[in-house]
Amino acid sequence: MIKLTQILTEVPSVDAKVCLTMVQRTKSRLRIVLEDGQDAGLLLPRGHILHHGSLLSTDDGFVVEVVAAKEQVSTARSDNPTLFAKGCYHLGNRHVPLQVEAGWCRYQHDYVLDEMLIGLGLQVTVENEAFQPEAGAYGGTTGGHSHGDAYDDSLEKASHEHAHGHPHKHEH
């Protein structure tokens, strides 16, 4: 198995690619399959979120480029800047990872959030697109709280310790 242990900023060439969802790009320990079918494992420093185009490397210089997978997302649109800002405010108030662009925002599909935004007057469509949420108000990579990832031989299990003061649940 290929063990990807480093995050790089630039390389002369890429040896392979891997397509990962947003949730997978938040993991520092994860078993993955490269686009060419090779088994690999992420053994990365904690606290980093991978993005489309991130470059990973083994200790011996084998380089893998991350591709953001298309996944089910909701995209909310409005030509009204005030209405759009209100929609983004309500999503942020619920700690929803959010990709914000001019006139539209995107989040992992949730019909309850869709209905809330439609009720506010935004147009919402469910799509299969790459999802690149904002890093957060403080530029942090973990969305305001931390998740401890414990490595085991299968690279598939993760502990779930929290370091924050507000209750919510996560599904894994």
Swiss-Prot record:
Subcellular location: Cytoplasm
Gene Ontology CC annotations of this record: cytoplasm
UniProt xrefs under SUPFAM superfamilies: Urease metallochaperone UreE, C-terminal domain, Urease metallochaperone UreE, N-terminal domain
GO biological processes: protein folding; protein-containing complex assembly; urea metabolic process
SS bonds (residue pairs): none
Keywords of the record: Chaperone, Cytoplasm, Nickel
Family indicated by similarity: Belongs to the UreE family.
Function: Involved in urease metallocenter assembly. Binds nickel. Probably functions as a nickel donor during metallocenter assembly.
Protein name, per record: Urease accessory protein UreE
Organism of this sequence: Shewanella halifaxensis (strain HAW-EB4)
Gene name for this UniProt entry: ureE
